């Protein structure tokens, strides 16, 4: 069973260290806040497609440099329901207080599938994280699909799904983050129809 179609790339400018059998890799000794050569950016993108989730440790972003790096990977979007950083509509702060009880986005989901054109991935920058717990987890949907019977694949290939922003368990996990003074609900309920089987979203 293959993970995806790109797992045998010969990287020339970066060192990619796979961290799990199903997906994920870490790229070390690189400063993403710098104006990196196009060749490095291209290989970072290839690694993202190959491993679906990639990690970079010890990064120091300002909002400007975070946005600049994201723009070299793809086109940043504005998250429709939570207020963004001032002057940086594409960057959404996720703030947690000790009294917060909800886990923001804390069930299995693909980000913003209720949009007509969901983004190709999500970029997370951890500024202050707990010593343990608070994990973000991913699953390899290529592998999940490939493990199905041919009959089930053919059945799923014919289906479309209605994705609605306000009628899911994910929507309920937004409540705590909307309580903060710096964030809040905005916009109307969104809905989009997508094929059940499609290209997976990917994360940095």
Region locations from a protein language model:
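Non-heme Fe(II) oxygenase catalytic core, chiefly the N-lobe of the double-stranded beta-helix
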Residues: 2-202
């Amino acid at each position: 069973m293959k993970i995806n179609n790109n797992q045998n790339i010969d990287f020339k400018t970066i060192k990619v260290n796979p961290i799990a059998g199903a997906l994920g890799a870490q790229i070390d000794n690189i400063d993403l806040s710098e104006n990196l050569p196009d060749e490095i950016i291209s290989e970072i993108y290839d690694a993202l497609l190959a491993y679906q989730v990639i990690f970079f440790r010890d990064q120091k972003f300002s909002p400007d440099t975070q946005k600049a790096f994201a723009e070299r990977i793809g086109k940043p979007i504005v998250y429709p329901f939570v207020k963004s950083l001032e002057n940086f509509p594409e960057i959404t702060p996720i703030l947690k207080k000790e009294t917060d009880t909800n886990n923001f986005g804390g069930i299995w989901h693909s980000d913003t599938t209720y949009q007509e054109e969901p983004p190709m991935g999500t970029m997370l920058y951890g500024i202050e994280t707990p010593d343990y717990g608070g994990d973000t987890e991913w699953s390899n949907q290529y592998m999940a699909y490939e493990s199905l019977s041919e009959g089930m694949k053919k059945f799923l290939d014919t289906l479309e799904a209605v994705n609605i922003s306000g009628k899911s368990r994910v929507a309920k996990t937004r409540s705590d983050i909307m309580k903060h003074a710096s964030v809040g609900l905005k916009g109307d309920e969104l809905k989009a129809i997508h094929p059940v089987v499609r290209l997976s979203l990917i994360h940095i």
